[in-house]
C-alpha cells in the first residue's frame, strides 16, 4: 500500500499548494509558477519562473530570495489504481549561479516516501532529508534525515509531508539563503 496517497482530483489542485509551499525561498512573493506533466502513469508537478524553458521538468528553475541561487522543485506521483496516486518523490535542489550563469548544485532536499523498508537507508530517505552536495565525501551521498523520529506522522498525508517540507524550507531560507 502506498505511503502517501491522493486522488487525481486532489492532485490536479495541488499545484497551488506547492507554489505556496515554496514561498519562503522564492524571489516572487506569491511563489513560483507551476505546471504539470502526465504520462506513463506519472503525474509530475514542477515549478519555474515564467514559461517552462523545456519539457523536462528537471531543467525548470525559479529565482530564490538570494540572487546567487536558483531552485528546482518537483513532485512525482505514480498511479496505483484508477484515479489514485501516491507520492514517489519530492525533490528540491538549490543551484549556486556564478557571473557566467553556470550552475553548480549546492544542496538538495529530497523525500522518497516509497523507499522499500528493507533498503539500507530507508529510515533516512523516506522523510525529508538533506544532501550537502558541495561538501567532501561522504556528505554528498549521505541522507541527513530531518524527521526520523516523527516519520510515521510526517508520512501520514499529503498535508503532513508538505508541513515537514515547509519547515525544512524555512530552515534553508534562514540558514543558507539569508547567510550567503
Residue ranges and their predicted role:
Residues 1-60:
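N-terminal "first-domain core" detector
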Residues 8, 13, 18, 69, ...:
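Short, intrinsically disordered low-complexity segments
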Residues 10, 29, 59, 75, ...:
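Glutamate identity and glutamate-enriched acidic tracts
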Residues 15-29, 96-98, 168-179:
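Hydrophobic, Leu/Ile/Phe/Ala-enriched alpha-helical segments that form helix-helix packing faces
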Residues 38-100:
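Amphipathic, interaction-prone secondary-structure segments
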Residues 82-157:
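An exposed acidic His-Trp-rich patch
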Residues 146-180:
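Long, compositionally biased interface segments
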